[in-house]
């Protein structure tokens, strides 16, 4: 991978991961346009580091707000921790249930099927982008009626919606969870904070999963160039640079997202997702 390719993938990941436009769809399409294989183990380590960069961007950006909301007192911490636990539990039940169900169903006709085989499917990505766009636009009409609180029930709904995003590249996690909160009357700032708190809880599990996939690729000899004398440092150096780039891009993306939420421009992201779905169909 050239420096230009690394730069493009890192910036796309940093912005799209934290904007409600689906980072996976954008990164996969960018990799395809540049002739890179989005399912190759070689890119797995880079993507792990890019996700790490955006996770740190979320922590840095929201830390002051979370400290006032989540860590202001012991009761506040317990209450918010319970909301996160309830939402994450539903994410696991719905998300991993879907992953297992889809894999089981597809293996009836394709014995060697793995869920990763769906990730590069342009039609599925386009459909998921369109669905996310519609959800964002519909929820934007509720922005003027946000007087509710974030209850355990609402947190569980948000967690379930997050679970629906796991198998489908193009269905923006942040877009879906923030939209779900807004649609249920949760104040937009609270919905945004909770959505990204959920991301920080979920991201380490994703990193472990992708890291294990990379380890298996090395152990199985899928990364042949590592067996011919090159060390992991050959991949680590560009991955660390990518992590820094995605961190900086992520901070800019979060500021952009917060401003548009405050200014009532949430629906613009939905319109973008609808347009992007058409582009994915045309290019894919």
Predicted feature residues:
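Multi-pass membrane proteins that catalyze or facilitate reactions on polyprenyl-/lipid-phosphate substrates
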Residues: 1-284
